[in-house]
Swiss-Prot record:
This is Large ribosomal subunit protein bL36. PANTHER family: 50S RIBOSOMAL PROTEIN L36 2 (PTHR47781), LARGE RIBOSOMAL SUBUNIT PROTEIN BL36B (PTHR47781:SF1). The keyword Ribosomal protein applies. It comes from Bradyrhizobium sp. (strain ORS 278). Keywords: Ribonucleoprotein, Ribosomal protein. The keyword Zinc does not apply. One of its GO terms (biological process) is translation.
Length: 41
């Protein structure tokens, strides 16, 4: 999992990217291309 300052640009890189909030943190998850998994931090 990568840690990024801005997830908005990362979200646009693949069609299946989803922005989710869990426990106060923001994540990008992708069930098709798992290499796009990231956390904002």
């Amino acid at each position: 999992m990568k840690v990024r300052n801005s997830l908005k640009s990362l979200r646009g890189r693949h069609r299946a990217n989803r922005l989710v909030r869990r426990k106060g943190r923001v994540y990008v998850i992708n069930k098709v291309q798992r290499r796009f998994k990231a956390r904002q931090g």
